[in-house]
Amino acid sequence: MFLSRKITKNARTIVQCQRFFQTSIFSQNAAPQSPIKVFMDTFRAELKKSQELQDSVKALQDSSGSLSESDTFKKARDAYEKARSGTTAASSFTGKTVGKAGAKIGSYAQKAWESAPVQLSKKVISSTANTVATGVDTATKPVRETAFYKTIKQTMSDGSTSSRYGFYADKEQRKKLREEFERRNRMFASSARIQPNEDVQSVVVHSNPSWKNKVEQIKNESRLVRKIQELKKSYQESEHPIVSSIRDMADSISGVWSRMFSETEASQVMRRFKEIDPSFNTEHFLQYLREYIVPEVTEAYVKGDKEVLKTWLSEAPFSVYETTTKEYAKHGVVSVGKILDIRGVDIMSQRLLQPNDIPVFIVTFRTQEVHMFKDASSGELVAGKDDRIQQCTYASVFTRVEDELDNPETRGWRIVDFARARAVDYF
């Protein structure tokens, strides 16, 4: 029984496999269709689907039209219109009621504010506040009158008059700022230099300690020391190729070593300025440049003020400027330009000028100027425009003369070179 069932199952499987292979062979042996025929069949099928869709939409529109014309739909629409009109009327009535209530409340509040009790309470509060303020002022008055408080008040700044990014003021304001700056910072050499006492003429010479005398005696009398000195002299003066090569190599190594650990040019410049004025400070000098020196010199340069320029400029740049102004004077014109703004005042580099190793600061800054020239006799404008603003870049070289530290105007600062590097129209 079991064996017969298994045979029947296997027979069915074989029959199914035969049918599958027959179908595959038939489908593979079928004639292929052309692309045009496939396209036409697909087009007809899509057209038929489109026609069926149009018929369905038309039927839906007909049913919608009949629905809108039915009695039930009309009753629902009338009920909606009545409900909306009722809501509008209720909201209008509510708005009017609230407005009337607000007006009444406002009038009551105004009457209450102007009533006698409230006015009395306002007077009491005001007098109490004045009493408290007066008490605080009286209590803090001894503190505010101390020297420490005044010093802190003068030192602190809110940054509104900061000259770090841009600064330009008229001549009177610059002088006031300069006086305040000198008093506050005490940066000038007159406060740090030790004046010589001409009344004292005697000189006290201190003798060397005894151990130094003994060292000098050993150097002069020791044979070993003399031998070492002779060998050193022979090494330095020898012309032997090997000794000369060794000496050159040693000199190059010592040169590299000295360059690695020697002073930079900037540090040498700072040391020289410190030797001239021990109280010198770079930040204070930059502030002094921005607030006084640069505006003073630049304004004189643009307006043609020779007296101010002669005070600050050295002989070479002043001669160049004077030659230029003489050409203007020959044509009977004078400069009446003006400075609008000064920005970017900064020390670009520090240098030692040869051959005397003069320490200098190279300072650059930008200005906004108006250049105009008028006739010296009639005062008529002959060149330039009042609304033509130019942005100019300046380069200047500053040094300090020790013999002029007591000059109340320059404090020893002198401009070695001053030139306008570039000028372009701002507008």
UniProtKB/Swiss-Prot annotation:
Q: Its gene? A: tim44
Which Gene Ontology terms cover its molecular function?
ATP binding; ATP hydrolysis activity; protein-folding chaperone binding
Provide the assembly information: Heterodimer with pam18. Component of the PAM complex, at least composed of mtHsp70, mge1, tim44, pam16, pam17 and pam18. The complex interacts with the tim23 component of the PAM complex.
Kindly report the protein's main subcellular placement as a broad class: mitochondrion
Keywords, comma-separated and alphabetical: ATP-binding, Membrane, Mitochondrion, Mitochondrion inner membrane, Nucleotide-binding, Protein transport, Transit peptide, Translocation, Transport
Pfam families the record matches? Tim44
As for what it does, the entry says:
Essential component of the PAM complex, a complex required for the translocation of transit peptide-containing proteins from the inner membrane into the mitochondrial matrix in an ATP-dependent manner. Recruits mitochondrial HSP70 and its co-chaperone (mge1) to drive protein translocation into the matrix using ATP as an energy source.
Q: Which protein family is it in? A: Belongs to the Tim44 family.
Lineage, highest ranks first: Eukaryota, Fungi, Dikarya, Ascomycota, Taphrinomycotina
Name its GO BP terms in alphabetical order. Answer: protein import into mitochondrial matrix
Question: Is Nucleotide-binding one of the keywords?
Answer: yes
Look up the domain of life of the source: Eukaryota
Name of the protein in its database record: Mitochondrial import inner membrane translocase subunit tim44
Query: How does this protein lie in the membrane?
Result: Peripheral membrane protein
Q: Which GO terms describe its cellular component?
A: mitochondrial inner membrane; PAM complex, Tim23 associated import motor
Q: Where does ATP bind?
A: 90-97
Task: Name the PANTHER family for this protein.
Answer: MITOCHONDRIAL IMPORT INNER MEMBRANE TRANSLOCASE SUBUNIT TIM44
